[in-house]
């Protein structure tokens, strides 16, 4: 065991280094080749804000519209994310420059925003909304800053550039609100190798925008929809007065630049993080610390157990041994079925379902099959996998329920299929009603909700029943000792054996292993960032499984040594103790990182956080429970019982 613990951290470290070599490569999407002057379609995705957490579709604001609005057919994941991809009137041609062009309106007739439209635009700007566009499925990014470099190395300068996703709708200054009504698009292309008798082809490899606010009086437009921007700082920004009508032009320009970025690396701009070094060192530190502590805990348990088992198996000292306190004294009660075995087995079945789903999703994403360029693929895959993993959840729940002397398998199967999913659906439905009330694109449409219910009752529930049926018919787990008819009296327990104290103690190590990844995941969810470090996430998931298992074994061992055989529910709750720290961290993140002040955004945050904490508790509790159950069966099978 000690030898195994010696090489395990190094092998995992090597594995994580291997994952880094392809961490930012995004396969799975075929490139599109453009010829000179081919149209490059600019589409809008949505409007987002980290302050409100309510996405809106692009045309919820009075932007210029094309002659025919066409929405893209979306998958389940895109709908759940609030994406509403739609065409826009921007006319962009491959490698064709445009200095300035009026998007809608005429030289003598600018766009007029009504009082209601002006109020809505001003409200969205004050709520710090971002606009998200895509060109050739590549999201638009805004260049934030360029650090100076004394050596003048352009490549090094390029690495120091920071980007944010989308562009700001506008800005406020001295209680006045200004709209970004001119967009300077900068598109980078990579020239493909020229074949014989064929013209050059190009691929879009980066999409940037420089948003500007230009006052109506400073723009000069002609009858051909061309315009002239003021030079330098001679212009004033376009103010939006929410109390009256506002007139303005929506304009844009297009600039093309050749780039040596290859198509396979074009997502690096969005996936590279500025603090990646901190991320690396934190992950490595977590690996070393967690496995070092896990090794120590394992050695303590193994050495203590060897001594206990050796003493218990000495026939000469058997009477002295039985007079001592220890885990062997509760051998006749340790496998006594707990209260509410149906609920316990149902929760553990849902935990198995979650475990299988998360493991497969992370592994497939680590291989690059669920790239950000395939919008909504991650969430769609997770939903369908959870449905189909119901057969494994039902099987494990059915077998455990029979082991716990349960008899009503049909009711147990229904409980497994509906308890956790029902809570999730109920919370999501209530939150969705509030989102509907705000007319947000984040609200799940009624047909999609019906489709989800059909998937639940048409796929998940039958599969859970099928798995439960076979699990209940299978031979129950073989417990190595018989259960006494009369329960043993439990002595008074010390304060540190309290259930809540156990939750606090058991949750520290697993939470410490995943703390850094949790920060990046929260940033991706609540601050509209991309997350693609699934190599790291897979490593952290393995660490989480190992640490939860080892901590669970330690906790159940000390509980049995205290002659308390009621370990079933307690171990399930204590093993999920890291979920308590996730909740505490979520509150800390809300207070210190987010600028949410309104009721509905706060309700959404804590509603979805509650679902996350519940799911994480089920996951870690299930991992710890089965590790402890295997451990208990193993140690009682190793001693002689008279």
UniProtKB/Swiss-Prot annotation:
Residues 303-346, 398-416, 471-501, 557-570, 620-642 are cytoplasmic. Keywords: Endosome, Golgi apparatus, Membrane, Phosphoprotein, Signal, Transmembrane, Transmembrane helix. The chain crosses the membrane at residues 282-302, 347-367, 377-397, 417-437, 450-470, 502-522, 536-556, 571-591, 599-619. It is a multi-pass membrane protein. GO terms for biological process: cell adhesion; phagocytosis; positive regulation of protein exit from endoplasmic reticulum; positive regulation of protein localization to cell surface; protein localization to membrane; regulation of intracellular pH; response to hypoxia; vacuolar proton-transporting V-type ATPase complex assembly. Residues 24-281, 368-376, 438-449, 523-535, 592-598 are extracellular. The keyword Signal applies. It is found in: Membrane; Golgi apparatus; Early endosome. Belongs to the nonaspanin (TM9SF) (TC 9.A.2) family. This is Transmembrane 9 superfamily member 4. The gene is TM9SF4.
């Amino acid at each position: 065991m000690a030898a195994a613990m010696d090489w395990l951290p190094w092998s995992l470290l090597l594995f994580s280094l291997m994952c880094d070599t392809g961490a930012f490569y995004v396969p799975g999407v075929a490139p599109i080749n453009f010829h000179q002057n081919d149209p490059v379609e600019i589409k809008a995705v949505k409007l987002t804000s980290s302050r409100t957490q309510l996405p809106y579709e692009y045309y919820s604001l009075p932007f210029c519209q094309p002659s025919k609005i066409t929405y893209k057919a979306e998958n389940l994941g895109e709908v759940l994310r609030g994406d509403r991809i739609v065409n826009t009137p921007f006319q962009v041609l491959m490698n064709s420059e445009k200095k300035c062009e009026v998007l809608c309106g005429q030289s003598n007739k600018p766009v007029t925003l009504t009082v209601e439209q002006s109020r809505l635009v001003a409200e969205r700007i004050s709520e710090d909304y971002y606009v998200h566009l895509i060109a050739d499925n590549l999201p638009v990014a805004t260049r934030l800053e360029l650090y100076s470099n004394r050596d003048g190395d352009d490549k090094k300068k390029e690495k120091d550039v920071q980007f944010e996703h989308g562009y700001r709708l506008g800005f406020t200054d001295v209680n006045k609100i200004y709209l970004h009504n001119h967009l300077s698009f900068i598109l980078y292309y990579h020239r493909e190798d020229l074949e014989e008798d064929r013209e050059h082809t190009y691929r879009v490899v980066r999409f940037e925008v420089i948003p500007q606010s230009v006052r109506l009086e400073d723009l000069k437009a002609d009858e051909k929809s061309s315009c002239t921007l003021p030079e330098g700082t001679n212009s004033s920004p376009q103010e939006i007065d929410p109390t009256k009508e506002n007139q303005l032009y929506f304009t844009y320009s297009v600039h093309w630049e050749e780039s040596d970025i290859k198509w396979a690396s074009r997502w690096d701009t969005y996936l590279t993080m500025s603090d990646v070094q901190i991320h690396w060192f934190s992950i490595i530190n977590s690996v070393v610390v967690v496995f070092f502590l896990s090794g120590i805990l394992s050695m303590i348990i193994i050495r203590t157990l060897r001594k206990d088992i050796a003493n218990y198996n000495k026939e000469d000292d058997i009477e002295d041994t039985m007079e001592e306190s220890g885990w062997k004294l509760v051998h006749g009660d340790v496998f006594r079925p707990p209260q509410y075995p149906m609920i316990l087995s149902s929760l553990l079945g849902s935990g198995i379902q979650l475990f299988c789903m998360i493991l497969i999703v992370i592994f497939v994403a680590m291989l690059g099959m669920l790239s950000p360029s395939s919008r909504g693929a991650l969430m769609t895959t997770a939903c369908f996998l959870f449905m189909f993993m119901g057969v494994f959840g039902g099987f494990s729940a059915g077998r455990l329920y029979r082991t716990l002397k349960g008899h009503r398998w049909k009711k147990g199967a229904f409980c497994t299929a509906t308890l956790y999913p029902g809570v999730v659906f109920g919370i999501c439905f209530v939150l969705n009603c509030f989102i509907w009330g705000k007319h947000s694109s984040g609200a799940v449409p009624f047909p999609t909700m019906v489709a989800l219910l059909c998937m639940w009752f048409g796929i998940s529930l039958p599969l859970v029943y099928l798995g439960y049926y076979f699990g209940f018919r299978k031979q129950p787990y073989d417990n190595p000792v018989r259960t006494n008819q009369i329960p043993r009296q439990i002595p008074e327990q010390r304060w540190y054996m309290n259930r809540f104290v156990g939750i606090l103690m058991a949750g520290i190590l697993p939470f410490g292993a995943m703390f850094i990844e949790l920060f990046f995941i929260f940033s991706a969810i609540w601050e509209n960032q991309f997350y693609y470090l699934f190599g790291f996430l897979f490593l952290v998931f393995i660490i989480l499984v190992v640490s939860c298992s080892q901590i669970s074994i330690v906790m159940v061992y000390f509980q049995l040594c205290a002659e308390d055989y009621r370990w079933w529910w307690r171990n399930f709750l204590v093993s999920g103790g890291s979920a308590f720290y996730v909740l505490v961290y979520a509150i800390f993140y809300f207070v210190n990182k987010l600028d949410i002040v309104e009721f509905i955004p706060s309700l959404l945050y804590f509603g979805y956080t509650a679902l996350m904490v519940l799911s994480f508790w089920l996951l870690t509790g299930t991992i710890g429970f089965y590790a402890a159950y295997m451990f208990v069966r193993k140690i009682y099978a190793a001693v002689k019982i008279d």
